[in-house]
Curated annotation (Swiss-Prot):
Keywords: Aminoacyl-tRNA synthetase, ATP-binding, Cytoplasm, Ligase, Magnesium, Metal-binding, Nucleotide-binding, Protein biosynthesis. Tetramer of two alpha and two beta subunits. GO terms for molecular function: ATP binding; magnesium ion binding; phenylalanine-tRNA ligase activity; tRNA binding. Its main location: cytoplasm. This is Phenylalanine--tRNA ligase alpha subunit. Mg(2+) binds at residue 262. One of its GO terms (cellular component) is cytoplasm. It comes from Thermus thermophilus (strain ATCC BAA-163 / DSM 7039 / HB27). It holds the Pfam family tRNA-synt_2d.
Length: 350
């Protein structure tokens, strides 16, 4: 039995097979255990002799089992290490990494410029009411200024639009044509003084070409308080120009009409590298009728008027135009064309 058992133990291929051999010989119903149980039937002298033989066999089997178990464990460990070994000389697996969209990069840069000047960045809804997009901004129905904006009007029932304080807003709905509605929303919910910028996406129903898109981005600015003048507006635009184009940049203001500001101006920045004036956006002093519309809306909500005796300025500029200048992009349609080769150029740009 001993020779047979030792040979079987030595040839065991894995720990499961070794466990089965241990049970076969040393288990409760094992061969050696049964032999030892039969010792009681033997005469005393023969029992003593046979008991010594069986104990020696048991010790030999236990030693062989322990040695084989250790050998199998070492072999399994070696195999696992070999299987999991990493060849550090092999080239690493390349991982796909994304990057920020150039519009996001430009928008973040603009917001950070104004945050350094004490402005707070806020956002408004893209689905807007006719009141906030037009009426409250001194662009009533049938006003000729509405022809300046080609609008996406929304049809259908069941959409609830919330106002600045969570109230339900009635009237026709549209995709906002500019970020200016957030001026009114913010003024309804807050009292001056304050400085805010409003980055966001806007929509115009117009034909697309290299410089025009139906969907684009604007950055709106609004400052309201006592004694705010055109000089403060010019100072803010000068700071923007120097942050974007360097300390040698110059700013030019030209009079222009916008219904929600009076006086209104269009501002351009001298671009030293390009050697030309770049029209960036429009600005002006907030029209008194806008303040009146805000106070009237506040009173309907049971709030006291807050915009009598204050002044403010507002400005707006196109994010795409600045991004095209910053990154040398010739066609605005590249931004939303979905071409990976174009977008991958901006990996790592912060």
């Amino acid at each position: 039995m001993l020779e047979e058992a030792l040979a079987a133990i030595q040839n065991a291929r894995d720990l499961e097979e070794l466990k089965a051999l241990k049970a076969r010989y040393l288990g409760k119903k094992g061969l050696l255990t049964q032999e030892m149980k039969g010792l009681s039937a033997l005469p005393l002298e023969e029992r003593r002799k046979r008991g010594q033989e069986l104990n020696a066999i048991k010790a030999a089997l236990e030693a062989a089992l322990e040695a084989r178990e250790k050998a199998l464990e070492e072999a399994a460990l070696k195999e696992a290490l070999e299987r999991e070994r990493v060849d550090v000389s092999l080239p690493g697996a390349s991982l796909f990494s994304g990057g920020l969209h150039p519009i996001t990069l430009m928008e973040r840069e603009l917001v950070e410029i104004f945050r350094a000047l004490g402005y707070q960045a806020v956002e408004g809804p893209e689905v807007e009411s006719e009141f906030f997009n037009f009426d409250a901004l001194n662009i009533p129905e049938h006003h000729p200024a509405r022809d300046m904006w080609d609008t996406f009007w929304l049809a259908g029932e069941g959409f609830r639009l919330e106002g600045p304080l969570g109230e339900e807003v009635e009237g026709r709905l549209l995709l906002r044509t500019h970020t200016s509605p957030m001026q009114v929303r913010y003024m309804v919910a807050h009292t001056p003084p304050f400085r805010i910028v409003v980055p966001g996406r806007v929509f115009r129903f117009e034909q697309t070409d290299a410089t025009h898109e139906a969907v684009f981005h604007q950055l709106e600015g609004l400052v309201v308080g006592e004694g705010i003048t055109m000089a403060h507006l010019k100072g803010a635009i000068y700071e923007l120009a120097q942050a974007l184009f360097g300390p040698d940049s110059k700013v030019r203001f030209q009079p222009v009409y916008f219904p929600f500001v009076e006086p209104g101006a269009q501002f351009a920045v001298w671009w030293p590298e390009g050697g030309k004036w770049l029209e960036l956006g429009g600005a002006g002093m907030v029209h008194p009728k806008v303040f009146q519309a805000v106070d009237a809306y506040r009173e309907r909500l049971g709030l006291p008027s807050a915009y009598r005796g204050v002044t403010g300025f507002a400005f707006g500029l196109g994010v795409e135009r600045l991004a095209m200048l910053r990154y040398g992009i010739p066609d605005i349609r590249y931004f939303f064309g979905g071409r990976l080769k174009f977008l991958e150029q901006f990996k790592g740009v912060l």
